[in-house]
Amino acid sequence: MTPQPSGAPTVQVTRETERSFPRASEDEVTCPTSAPPSPTRTRGNCAEAEEGGCRGAPRKLRARRGGRSRPKSELALSKQRRSRRKKANDRERNRMHNLNSALDALRGVLPTFPDDAKLTKIETLRFAHNYIWALTQTLRIADHSLYALEPPAPHCGELGSPGGSPGDWGSLYSPVSQAGSLSPAASLEERPGLLGATFSACLSPGSLAFSDFL
């Protein structure tokens, strides 16, 4: 057998491969040559776009929206401040109304000399304090005088000052604290002249002026 040249089989193989596998078009050949974009590059591009152009548009929109919403927010704040101020004024008005009503009711039970005397708020409170103190001292004197042979009738100046120490207030007359003592109503029924004389000596307009209670 004669040796065949080395180039012949290679030509046949290449022709057979060309027949079995048709040649791809130029477009199909060029597509695979271009490498697919890596995910890291796409992420990097998106990040750069967000840093650059993607963030520019929202900033402009925010600036426009912020400029338009400023008057609305200021208007809402002013309305809210007005409503709060109105509520605070209403609360203060109601508080003063209740206080004035209570002071008027207190003035109605306090004896005044003359009757048409108009007391201020602080004068009403001081007069009520001193008047309650005088009544308490009178009841204490009447209660202690029931068991004495000769009931003393001390002068009102010896009773002490209404603005004394808190210990003086603790020693005042109390129907519950003193066992066996008669109630003020029983004292008045048994000895009606005793309390009247003591009370008139301490609270009569002739002995004490109205300014002494203020």
Curated annotation (Swiss-Prot):
- Example GO biological process term? spinal cord development
Question: What ranges does the record give for the region Disordered, renumbered to this chain?
Answer: 1-98
Which residues fall in a compositionally biased region of kind Basic residues? 57-70, 79-88
Please give the GO cellular component terms listed in this UniProt entry. Answer: chromatin; nucleus
- Please note every region of biased composition (Basic and acidic residues): 15-26
Subunit (UniProt): Efficient DNA binding requires dimerization with another bHLH protein. Interacts with ATOH8.
Annotated function: Acts as a transcriptional regulator. Together with NKX2-2, initiates transcriptional activation of NEUROD1. Involved in neurogenesis. Also required for the specification of a common precursor of the 4 pancreatic endocrine cell types.
Associated clinical condition? Diarrhea 4, malabsorptive, congenital: A disease characterized by severe, life-threatening watery diarrhea associated with generalized malabsorption and a paucity of enteroendocrine cells.
Descriptive protein name: Neurogenin-3
Source organism of the structure: Homo sapiens (Human)
